[in-house]
Amino acid sequence: MAEQPLADDPSAHRRRLGDDLRRSREALGLTQQQAADQLEWSLSKLIRIENGAHGVSVSDLRSMIGAYRISGQRQVDALMTAARASRAKAWWSPYRDVVPTPFARYLGYEASAVRFRIFHPFLVPGLLQTGEYAAELLKTLPDARRAQLLLELKRERQQRVFAQPGPSFVFVMGEEGLYRWIGGREVMQRQLAYLAEVARRPNTQLRIVPFEAGAYPGMAGPLVLLKLAENGEEVAFLESVGGDELIRDEPATITKYADNFETMVGKSLSRERSETLIRERVEQLGRPEAQGTDSRGAR
């Protein structure tokens, strides 16, 4: 299947625009400091624009077009269009009060990803959580309003990610996620039935790391790896009690996490065995005696 990005997002426009402007600067042989001096800007402002961390006003873009001697009308028009799009509000703007900065930045990358590789050691990954399963998890938060907004954010995020057929997905989860009771038997049964449905999608792999796999690299916490449409670059997103972390422009670090992910895939059951295990667990949860039963041997 050809890899296609998701629908455009302001942060994706910022990154593309930053890359285009950086290439134009480099074509003239200008360093970032030389360009900043010529534009009478701070170096940090130029760096933020080139990194896609900051939108570009039309007036600033005109200054850069002049400084970089960009004369082709088609290129100028494309840059202007991208600059306007880069300053639009992101879809998650209504949730900014409850979204930590690293996750907000991650959402911008997610919107232009062509491949998702996602791992969770003991829960169903967020993109695959049903509404009632997610709601049960969010009940642990002391602020009910925050919990409701996060639930709405998750629902909209899922809809956006799965709205396009282009991206490919590899989900890996620890077998514990099939047995940890979130919301009770019926909630878990519906959640796992949904996982079994997802497992059959042609663009999706869902793999279970069995208990018997023992210890493995990366098992300490959730991990997301995204391959971006713009340039094939990968970014990593990590969740932890100490705070979330988004990693970009650190190839060696991202390679380490990618290697860990592939190790987890290697220790997981095949797609077919994973789906079978999930369906067996769904059937088990449908039996009255399932309440509180550990049936890890039902494979």
Task: Tell me what each language-model feature is.
Residues 45-50, 242-246:
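A ubiquitous short alpha-helical element
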